Amino acid sequence: MLLYLVLGLATALIGLVLFWYVQVQNVEIGRYTVIEADGDIEVRQYPAVVVAEITQTGSRDQAVRSGFGPLARYIFAKEREGEKIAMTAPVTQKAVASAWTIQFVMPSGYDLERLPKPTDPHVRLRQLPPTRRAAIRFSGWWTDDLFRLKDAALIGWMAKKGLTPVGTPTFAYYNDPFTPGFLRRNEILYDLAP
């Protein structure tokens, strides 16, 4: 009897992992071209993209949690007429003065004219210009300690390469909060001076 219970639980777990994997594979990932790669660090060229964004106050963790809801309601047409917009990855977050701006990149094929207007006055649509960025990729839980460690590694690498970061870092989250830390894809990115 115990053997059947264990086999049943193992089968259910495998099913959940496969379901999660299929869901992750169906999410459009933001496009970029790798210019230079060194282990977990890359210099990338990003094309112009359209984002839906919101600015929230509080800690990094509080801001991304409170900012996610209004952006999700926008793309899933919960507070507006029209079609749903597919979720993409990553969700990004950047410190701006004493607040945080959280962004959802719109799927390729959308431009500012084609996107429905947000009904929430705090949600903004904006086109970002092409940009060159340095990025470090890592897995793990979204903790400030881990982010500080990886941020320091990226800053040190840029200094050795003679690259000048512009502004504050962007935190990029590729997975939902239910994904185990060891399976997560996280990144820290800096825009680079020309």
Describe every region a protein language model picked out.
Residues 1-194:
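A solvent-exposed interaction/effector surface
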